[in-house]
Amino acid sequence: MNKLIAILLLALSLPALAALEVAGVKFDDKAKVGAGDTVINGAGMRKRAFFKVYAIGLYLPQKAATAAEALNSKGAKRIAIVTLRDLTAEQFVDALIEALKNNHDEAAMKTLQPKVDQFRNTMLTIGNAPEKSVVHLDWLPETGTRLTFNGAQKGADIAGEDFYRALLRIWLGDKPAQDDLKEQLLGKTG
């Protein structure tokens, strides 16, 4: 009987054990992204100097151990970001675009530029992102990259998976925004 109770308690606690917590932010083990089901691949914290900037979780259709697997995974995806300090939309998007440029050559950036401009303009509609703001960058295979801020969609979806892969390279590229964060998003802990 005690063994049965222990097994039941373990089974009930498994979803809680599967969720990840970073800097007080809980990332659920699963997320519905459009019509697709995703699982948390990894989560970590972006830091600049001594400042905690945001907690981030990467959701994929299935777990990926390498950047290549994550970048090439088929189906819905989500980058979930929770700000850990007050940011302006301009600070936030300019830092993302700088990291985007670090992971793409001039020719690739020229091709992506109209989508980068659309993304920047959409991000700027946020205005300020107070601490604990939630930003989702979703890949919806049927429509494109969708930006939501605190649960509300911002702007039109950005067509083309090339742009979403470019966004992923900010954190998973050859020159990631932060090396240890790349490892954490790939499910490695250190």
Walk through the language-model features, giving the residues of each.
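Mid-length scaffold segments of soluble, non-membrane domains
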Residues: 64-142
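Hydrophobic helical h-region of N-terminal Sec-dependent signal peptides
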Residues: 6-10
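N-terminal signal peptide c-region/cleavage motif recognized by signal peptidases
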Residues: 13-15
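Cysteine/selenocysteine-centered motifs that mediate thiol-based redox chemistry or coordinate metal-sulfur cofactors
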Residues: 179-190
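N-terminal secretory signal peptides
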Residues: 19-73
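Positively charged n-region of N-terminal signal peptides that target proteins for export
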Residues: 1-4
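Short strand-turn-strand beta-turns centered on an Asx-Gly dipeptide
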Residues: 149-152
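Flexible glycine-rich active-site/ligand-binding loops centered on an Asp-His dyad
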Residues: 154-181
